[in-house]
Amino acid sequence: GVQVSWGISDRRYEKEPSVKITKKDEAKEEIETCTGIIYEGNSGNPDPEDPSKPDIGVNIVYTYAFEDQWPAYGDFDMNDVIVSINKMSITDNKKLTIQGNIRAVGSSRKTGIGIQFLNVSSSGVTLSGKVQSGTPVFESGQSNPVVILSTNVHKYCNPSIADDDFTFYCTDPIAGGVYNSGNGAEFEIAQTFPTAEAAVKAMNINNIDVFIISKEAQGDTRRTEIHLPNYAPTNLGTTELFGMSNDASAYNNTLASQQKGYYISTEGLAWGICIPSTEVWKWPKERKK
């Protein structure tokens, strides 16, 4: 046989002598398959499952520092209560867990601490975790969900002391040489919401209103709460002290002035601050400027 060759552009092809070249549709043999397997495509899973959503976490440490003399400035050392939110995470789409510590107490009076959750509802929420009283509960008589972490932060940080022992905890380098020497009291608030959207909203740090209670309710007088600037008191907090002493946030029906904001001083100062960072903020020591 004769080997036939031909070229197209710069390419060259050769045909074996036993191979015949025919015109279109003139071949005498028909090839049904090339491999013996007919590929009909992948029909896929008829009932595919949605992929699980990844867990969400916030690793910023939020340190809150409070002065307990509101509406007066007091010594304004901002170490009367130090609390940190160390971690927030959402698991199983709907469960928000907040973990933190009450780290230091420089107050000389009985002081409590709580968290008010804004722009969310407690309806249908399952609550678990750990606070001073045991398992956290939503406080009754509140429009917003409120959880009290402790009614006596001195006792929570140092359970061995008496209920009326208000010795400083981790703020005084002189008294026993104790300052910034431990984690204090741990707390955890876990809320399982009806929807993932509600859990994400509750995780927004702007919706987490940490506050202290510097004086308990007495008779018809509601308790004295101290919040960060422009956060309103809870339903159980007094409004009678707004506009008094160094406070200029006149949310008090007996006052004529109409300044806006809560817990703001006449000089624009605050009784509560929040410091976001990658680590716990180093709070001021006692008797130090």
Summary of predicted features, one role per range:
Residues 1-289:
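Extracellular distal adhesion/interaction modules in secreted or cell-surface proteins
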